[in-house]
């Protein structure tokens, strides 16, 4: 709640086949490996103890792309004992290496000139994050996060990543989050969640949640957490869409301020939030500060927080 915009970065998580500690580090080897004019990408693991770069795929998978492997390695034992350089002898000269140094989903806190990476709670690391949206779901004046989770489109030799049901994270205003499980939040989506967006669909002053699924119906959750917030709709030159990029911030009766909220239509994966912003009302909101994309700044007094506040230039 310091007025600086932070970043939220979803990742593969720490519970996939790519998980690693200090013993085996995941790499991606990419280039024209087979010499056939096509660009290839192979997953590899660097074994720290033996200082060897090893293939991650089984031979039955790789030989479909590189038939010569069966001739060079008649048995699986021979293949398992070989390094990646030995398997593709003389064919990795033009290839490049990329190291997967961090698989955790994190929040990047803006410290003014630098970002501090802070991992999200462990429940956010159990499965990949495909989408995220930010709102003050419990109206306590601190921004919260919803994460769309799960990924099923994996190879036969890998396991399906389905440990998530959609995760609500309640923020503390200092960059920390607490996981709220489905039996408490009511959010239980067991499919492949993709896009997610928020909007006040029943005009009760609370941000509701819409979640899309791959090969499944979308899920709508009406919010009953906390008290109602302040509804704000921005218009620039008479258009709500032209207000995109404006920054809103609540000013409370005691002079303190809430978090900065960016009026951005985009949300998560191919999703769009409502143009009406819901500002959490932990304390009585006295006014709303707006920094418009044009550089103009304005302050609007809040007379009745129960009414929709429409602001424009």
Located regions from the model:
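Acidic, divalent-cation-chelating loop motifs in proteins
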Residues: 1-2, 30-34, 134-140, 198-204
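Catalytic or ion-translocation cores adjacent to nucleophile or general acid/base/metal-coordination motifs
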Residues: 15
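Gly/Ser/Thr/Pro-enriched helix-cap/hinge segments flanking short amphipathic alpha-helices
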Residues: 18-25, 36, 43-45, 70-81, ...
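C-terminal lobe substrate-recognition/regulatory segment of protein kinase catalytic domains
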Residues: 46-88
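Phosphate-binding active sites in nucleotide-utilizing proteins
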Residues: 143
């Amino acid at each position: 709640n310091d007025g600086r915009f932070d970043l939220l970065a979803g990742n593969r998580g720490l519970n996939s086949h790519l998980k690693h500690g200090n013993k085996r580090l995941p790499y991606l080897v990419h280039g024209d490996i087979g010499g056939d004019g096509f660009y290839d990408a192979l997953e590899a693991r660097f074994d720290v103890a033996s200082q060897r770069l090893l293939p991650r795929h089984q031979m039955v998978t790789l030989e479909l792309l590189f038939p010569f492997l069966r001739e060079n390695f008649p048995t699986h034992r021979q293949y398992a004992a070989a390094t990646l350089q030995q398997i593709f002898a003389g064919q990795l000269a033009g290839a490049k290496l990329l190291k997967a140094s961090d698989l955790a989903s994190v929040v990047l806190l803006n410290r003014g000139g630098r970002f501090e990476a802070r991992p999200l709670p462990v429940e956010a690391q159990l499965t990949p994050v495909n989408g995220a949206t930010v709102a003050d779901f419990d109206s306590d004046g601190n921004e919260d996060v919803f994460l769309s989770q799960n990924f099923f489109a994996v190879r036969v030799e890998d396991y399906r990543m389905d440990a998530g049901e959609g995760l609500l994270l309640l923020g503390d205003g200092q960059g920390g989050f607490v996981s709220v499980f489905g039996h408490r939040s009511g959010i239980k989506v067991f499919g492949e969640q993709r896009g997610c967006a928020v909007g006040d669909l029943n005009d009760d002053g609370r941000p509701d949640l819409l979640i899309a699924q791959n090969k499944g119906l979308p899920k709508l959750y009406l919010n009953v957490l906390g008290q109602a917030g302040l509804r704000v709709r921005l218009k620039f030159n008479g258009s709500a869409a032209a207000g995109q990029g404006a920054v809103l911030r609540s000013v409370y009766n005691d002079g303190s301020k809430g978090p900065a909220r960016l009026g951005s239509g985009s949300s998560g994966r191919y999703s769009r939030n409502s143009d009406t912003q819901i500002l959490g009302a932990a304390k009585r909101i006295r006014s709303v500060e707006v920094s418009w994309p044009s550089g103009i700044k304005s302050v609007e007094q809040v007379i009745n927080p129960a009414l929709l506040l429409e602001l424009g230039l």
